[in-house]
């Protein structure tokens, strides 16, 4: 019996040793940060850029392509992820205020978010792939999708009518090299 307990203790010690680096790198249960940067554009070829502290989608001419915002993506579950603006401490969020649901950028470092916190749910989007395109549904407000307007240079927003022709909810992503 004593030998069996020792074996179990040694096995536990070995497992803890083997996974120590994983737990040491991510104390307090924080998830590993596997952040990747992506270029993003809608199916009408509009890219994201900042104008007057607002994220908008439009057609950038070659001389202005450096204004294009790249999106940082941090996966937290197979299809759930956090989205932020690359190189900035701004995250995409879905906020409910009364009966109103709106998109906003919040001054938050994407690597500080934790999937286990209810207050971070507004930053969580569910990715749905359909062939080469991707849609992003809010986890905090199911049925609401990240979208762009058909017209250029309009703010990025959310819609609960993803099939309406006046809103675009399908995006292309390309990993930034």
UniProtKB/Swiss-Prot annotation:
SUPFAM superfamilies found in the cross-reference section: Cytokine
Biological source species: Equus caballus
Subcellular location: Secreted
A single GO BP: immune response
Annotated family: Belongs to the IL-1 family.
Source domain of life: Eukaryota
Any GO molecular function: interleukin-1 receptor antagonist activity
Gene3D superfamilies: 2.80.10.50
Protein purpose: Anti-inflammatory antagonist of interleukin-1 family of proinflammatory cytokines such as interleukin-1beta/IL1B and interleukin-1alpha/IL1A. Protects from immune dysregulation and uncontrolled systemic inflammation triggered by IL1 for a range of innate stimulatory agents such as pathogens.
Iron keyword on record: no
Signal peptide: 1-25
Protein name: Interleukin-1 receptor antagonist protein
Gene: IL1RN
Gene Ontology cellular component terms for the protein in this record: extracellular space
Keyword line: Disulfide bond, Glycoprotein, Secreted, Signal
Disulfide-bonded cysteines: 91-141
Keyword Secreted annotated: yes
Glycosylation site positions: 109
């Amino acid at each position: 019996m004593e030998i069996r307990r020792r074996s179990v203790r040694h096995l536990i010690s070995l497992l803890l040793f083997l996974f120590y680096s994983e737990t040491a790198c991510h104390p307090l249960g924080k998830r590993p940060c596997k952040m990747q940067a992506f270029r993003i554009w809608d199916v009408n070829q509009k890219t994201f850029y900042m104008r007057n502290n607002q994220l908008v989608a439009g057609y950038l001419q070659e001389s202005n392509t450096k204004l294009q915002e790249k999106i940082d993506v941090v996966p937290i579950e197979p299809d759930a992820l956090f989205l932020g603006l690359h190189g900035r401490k701004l995250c995409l969020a879905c906020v409910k205020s009364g009966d109103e649901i709106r998109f906003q950028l919040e001054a938050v470092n994407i690597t500080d978010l934790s999937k286990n916190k209810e207050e971070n749910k507004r930053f969580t989007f569910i990715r749905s792939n359909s062939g080469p395109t991707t849609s992003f549904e809010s986890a905090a407000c199911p049925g609401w999708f990240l979208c762009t307007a058909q017209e250029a240079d309009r703010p990025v927003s959310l819609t609960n009518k993803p099939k309406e022709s006046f809103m675009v909810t399908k995006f292309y992503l390309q990993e930034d090299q």
